[in-house]
Curated annotation (Swiss-Prot):
Disulfide bonds join 3-47, 14-34, 20-41, 24-43. InterPro entries: Defensin_plant, Scorpion_toxin-like, Scorpion_toxin-like_sf. This is Defensin-like protein 2. PROSITE patterns: GAMMA_THIONIN. CDD domains: Knot1 (cd00107). The keyword Aminoacyl-tRNA synthetase does not apply. SUPFAM superfamilies: Scorpion toxin-like. It comes from the Eukaryota. It comes from Sorghum bicolor. The keyword Disulfide bond applies.
Length: 48
């Protein structure tokens, strides 16, 4: 199962998945990508 949540530290519009993933990794997530019409950085990780 995959859990997803909005990044707490990402500021502004999310234009590059790589930037989002880097911030998510620093927050302890497994990665992340830009999502939705509002281009928010969403972090993902495995969860049970």
């Amino acid at each position: 199962r995959v859990c997803m949540g909005k990044s707490a530290g990402f500021k502004g519009l999310c234009m590059r998945d790589q930037n989002c993933a880097q911030v998510c990794l620093q927050e302890g997530w497994g990665g992340g990508n830009c999502d939705g019409v509002m281009r928010q950085c969403k972090c993902i990780r495995q969860c049970w």
